Amino acid sequence: MTHPVDAILDATGLNCPEPVMMLHNKVRDLAPGGLLKVIATDPSTRRDIPKFCVFLGHELVEQQEEAGTYLYWIRKKAD
């Protein structure tokens, strides 16, 4: 599924904890309600990114896996 995004975070080739650390910074700079697409190759993001969203109140709109690449669409919570 294709979602129009406001920003993209490419964390390919990075391992835990770097993708989530980068995600935290990128979401902070995103406008409330903005949609961020995250591209990652670290399998631990399947666990870490959904937990990140729940913990901070952001919406995990969708997640997909394509040949070892993990894709996430995250909507930043309203202030």
Curated annotation (Swiss-Prot):
- What keywords sit in the KW lines? Cytoplasm
Compartments, record wording: Cytoplasm
Looking at the keywords, is Cytoplasm present? Answer: yes
Family membership, please give it. Belongs to the sulfur carrier protein TusA family.
Per the Swiss-Prot or TrEMBL record, the active site comprises: C16
Provide the gene name from the record. Answer: tusA
PANTHER family per record: SULFUR CARRIER PROTEIN TUSA, SULFUR CARRIER PROTEIN YEDF-RELATED
| Lineage: superkingdom | Bacteria
Task: Name the chain's protein.
Answer: Sulfur carrier protein TusA
Q: What is the lineage of its organism?
A: Bacteria, Pseudomonadati, Pseudomonadota, Gammaproteobacteria, Pseudomonadales
Name of a matching Pfam family: TusA
Which terms does the record give in the GO molecular function aspect?
A: sulfur carrier activity
Q: What does this protein do?
A: Sulfur carrier protein which probably makes part of a sulfur-relay system.
Q: Does the keyword Cytoplasm apply?
A: yes
Q: Name one GO cellular component term.
A: cytoplasm
Tell me which NCBIfam families the record gives.
PRK00299.1
Listed GO biological process terms = tRNA wobble position uridine thiolation
Task: Spell out the CDD domains in the cross-references.
Answer: SirA (cd03423)
Among Gene3D superfamilies, the record links this protein to: TusA-like domain (3.30.110.40)
